[in-house]
Amino acid sequence: MSVRNNSAITPELIAHHGLKIDEYQRILELIGREPTFTELGIFSAMWNEHCSYKSSKKWLKTLPTKGKCVIQGPGENAGVVDIGNGQCVVFKMESHNHPSYIEPYQGAATGIGGILRDIFTMGARPVAAINALRFGSPDHPRTRHLVSGVVSGIGGYSNAFGVPTVGGEVNFDKRYNGNILVNAFAAGIAKIDSIFYSKAQGVGLPVVYLGAKTGRDGVGGATMASAEFDDAIDEKRPTVQVGDPFTEKCLLEACLELMALKAVIAIQDMGAAGLTSSSVEMGAKGNLGIELNLDKIPVREENMTAYEIMLSESQERMLMVLKPEMEKQAAAIFHKWGLDFSIIGKTTDDLRFRVLHQGKEVVNLPIKELGDEAPVYDRPWIAPSPKAILKAEEVKEIENFGDALLTLLNSADQSSRRWVYEQYDTFIQGNSLVRPGGDAGVIRVDNNDKHALAFSSDVTPRYCEADPYEGGKQAVAECWRNISATGATPLAATDNLNFGNPEKPEIMGQLVFAIKGIGEACKELDFPIVSGNVSLYNETNGESILPTPTIAGVGIIDDWLKVVTVGGMQDGDIIILVGPCGSHLGQSIYVRDILNIDTGTPPHVDLQLEKKNGQFVRDVINRGFIHAAHDISDGGLAIALAEMVIKSGKGIRAKLSNISPRHAELFGEDQGRYLIAIKPNALNSLKELSQTNMISLTELGTVEGDALDIKDTLSLSVSQLTQAYESWFPKFMGNST
């Protein structure tokens, strides 16, 4: 927007910047005058939902954020958790939803770039990435294009940067037709005594610009991300950033090299709202002012205005407060890596955010009110209405369970994601232990003979729509369960809360109750939230997405040689169900996709049972009793058995308990359950241990033959199951199987 800095501020201009009239009035009272055009843009960026969390902050404060291994919780670029031996894991999940819908390749690519910068800004070398993707209905005309662009963008950036993508999720629903979700997670490893923070310290110290040059790409991106879409979506294309993974790789190496010299006082990546957000956050956290001279900014386009420079979201850039005596060494390092290094300002003691451009002062604002004292709202909310219970006995049984299982395996939500993850380099760096497609990604920890880390991300949006509180609990529980199924002890989590317009009380109610559920589960499971992101206004023409509070977590494995996978079972192993037999069909994919029923409550999450069963499974893995483990979630027992058969290439002969109706036992999505493939010689020890710990076990059958054969219920060969499972995605994307 080419508007002069002294232009009159009109109601139209205020609305264009996403500010409410009362917010603008607050600005006038705060500064005692009309803001300049650049100042208006700065307030718009810092006070929007994306940067200030003004609608969610009250509720986010209720989440558990502390734990025995937590070094740094929310409030920094990423969370930091102790993993022993003087090392820590640094991790976070963030959304890039709106940009990825507008421009899928660059939106997804820069989402990866942004989350990687959050990690190495803290002094950690990125070692793993996962992503949680939600697309519209497969038959929507834009869906295939969006899937192709997003997956290519993620692969293009992460592969070139050199970080393995070790897992993730892909789901489809018509409620994402006009607003897809791209949630990106990254983790890095650092030394505990070498963590770097964004809090500026010291007066009169140099503020340094690092990395790539500034262009006009992404101007207004943070404000765009805090508004719902309408029919003018294509006009927002210039707000999408453009990424360069090779420059980011150089930036990583330069930053880590400089950090090793102990030259860095504070550092912040330029993400949402670019230079504005990074400088304001550094100053506000340190109770310092910041003065910038925009004439010192390296730019790649001519005649850029102060507004454009301050709000550009050009990628691969950092802001740093540097020890003055290290200036020459620091400059030499960044120039060696082909990056810009420019001293663009200084810290001050007056708590003002002052910006100079072409010899004139274009910004002079109170820095605290821009940063950590931005407006916070207690928005009205309506408690979600409870759904009627769908009893399994009231659901008519179908005639052919084998056909139903094949249909689910060949569906958009349950089919193999091989087409997706084979476009990612999952083994770069050489530490990945498990191929994507299982319960969790697992990597070895460098400089440690035995330790490994496990990663998972999870949420079931249809549960959250039916009951946000129970859905929030379930998202945490399934993430915790997936990590446990590898043998890892869950340590901590990060959240990415994706919802619609919080100004609608029913949407705000979804957010409130989901956070309550997440908080309860995290407390009970000792799984604190150490970082996260909130993405609101995920609506198009007033239609909201499904509430999608994604939870990603990290676990520690003491001996990576003991890791088990979904596909590790051996002939003769005994298949055991840990937990109760299936009985709950409400909100299951079986009733949704086979019977076209979308009613009922989601399954209740018994957190005591989750904790007890998860600890038991980790214990038997550590004792070496089992060859394989799998959590039971979407699709219930039948899908879990089929996936173990497909992943191992071996058959299972089993029988049902007949405690519940057959369709409920097969497809019920009751929580807190696992399948394990136990070594025959360990069965008696397993039973003794289960009795001691009061664990419910059901012996289902044995690993034998070349089919999944459930007595008097279904019999499907490994090849039939595999063909159904592997064929949907390539066919959808136009490739032969």
Curated annotation (Swiss-Prot):
The active site is at H50, H96. The lineage of its organism: Bacteria, Pseudomonadati, Pseudomonadota, Alphaproteobacteria, Hyphomicrobiales. Mg(2+) 1 binds at E94, N533. It comes from the Bacteria. GO terms for biological process: 'de novo' IMP biosynthetic process. Its EC number is 6.3.5.3. ATP binds at Y53, K92, D495, G532. GO terms for cellular component: cytoplasm. It is an enzyme of class 6 (ligase). CDD domains: PurL_repeat1, PurL_repeat2. Monomer. Part of the FGAM synthase complex composed of 1 PurL, 1 PurQ and 2 PurS subunits. GO terms for molecular function: ATP binding; magnesium ion binding; phosphoribosylformylglycinamidine synthase activity. Part of the phosphoribosylformylglycinamidine synthase complex involved in the purines biosynthetic pathway. Catalyzes the ATP-dependent conversion of formylglycinamide ribonucleotide (FGAR) and glutamine to yield formylglycinamidine ribonucleotide (FGAM) and glutamate. The FGAM synthase complex is composed of three subunits. PurQ produces an ammonia molecule by converting glutamine to glutamate. PurL transfers the ammonia molecule to FGAR to form FGAM in an ATP-dependent manner. The keyword ATP-binding applies. Keywords: ATP-binding, Cytoplasm, Ligase, Magnesium, Metal-binding, Nucleotide-binding, Purine biosynthesis. NCBIfam families: FGAM_synth_II, PRK01213.1. HAMAP family: PurL_2 (MF_00420). It catalyses: N(2)-formyl-N(1)-(5-phospho-beta-D-ribosyl)glycinamide + L-glutamine + ATP + H2O = 2-formamido-N(1)-(5-O-phospho-beta-D-ribosyl)acetamidine + L-glutamate + ADP + phosphate + H(+). This is Phosphoribosylformylglycinamidine synthase subunit PurL. Pathway: Purine metabolism; IMP biosynthesis via de novo pathway; 5-amino-1-(5-phospho-D-ribosyl)imidazole from N(2)-formyl-N(1)-(5-phospho-D-ribosyl)glycinamide: step 1/2. Belongs to the FGAMS family. It is found in: Cytoplasm. Disulfide bonds: none annotated. Mg(2+) 2 binds at D118, D269. Substrate binds at S95, H96, N97, H98, R117, Q241, E313, S314, Q315, S535.
